[in-house]
């Protein structure tokens, strides 16, 4: 009997999630990147409580749907944008299910021709890579080169989901802790 096309397709990788919802940082940080450790250090220093899931790398918001369900909150869609001159940078936080409309945002903030910023700018200003974009990366923007834009729907949620500057873990954090503790501490506003 011949194989059908569907039978011959094998997934290149099965996405794995450690289904345990942890409170706080990992007990063993061996093998974790420094930028992740520094993120936990700052959250702990500020007294910001968080829950954590560990998982395979997530490169897209679509890959986060199972994580959303386990965290019982929606992972934010974090878009790192720039203007045409490459001298103004923006981190936009919107609900994962919301469509991004460049023209609408451009008009709202008075910046024509927005586009996605290149990975080298993510690394330079936020010390993150594509797939790991997070509000927590703003702790690395010491010169406030990146303007934070938060969708009203995010601000109305009790919790938000984000990465600790690496896309192999996701955190559930009170939105009010990000807005009232984290952002003032790092000198950013929205």
Where are the regions that the model predicts?
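Extended, low-hydrophobicity, polar/charged segments
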Residues: 2-190
């Amino acid at each position: 009997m011949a194989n059908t096309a569907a039978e011959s397709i094998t997934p290149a990788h099965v996405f794995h999630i450690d289904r345990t919802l942890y409170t706080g940082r990992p007990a063993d940080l061996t093998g974790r990147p420094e930028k992740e450790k520094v993120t936990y250090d700052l959250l702990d220093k500020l007294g910001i409580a968080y829950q954590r899931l560990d998982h395979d790398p997530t490169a897209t918001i679509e890959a986060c749907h199972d994580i959303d369900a386990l965290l019982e909150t929606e992972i934010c869609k974090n878009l790192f944008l720039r203007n045409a001159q490459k001298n103004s940078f923006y981190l936009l936080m919107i609900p994962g299910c919301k469509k991004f409309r460049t023209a609408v945002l451009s008009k709202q903030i008075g910046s024509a021709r927005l586009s996605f910023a290149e990975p080298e700018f993510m690394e330079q200003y936020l010390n993150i890579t594509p797939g790991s974009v997070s509000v927590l990366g703003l702790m690395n923007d010491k010169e406030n080169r990146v303007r934070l834009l938060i969708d009203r729907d995010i601000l109305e949620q009790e919790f938000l989901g984000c990465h600790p500057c690496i896309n192999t873990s996701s955190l559930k954090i009170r939105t009010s802790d990000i807005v009232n503790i984290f952002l003032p501490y790092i000198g950013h506003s929205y």
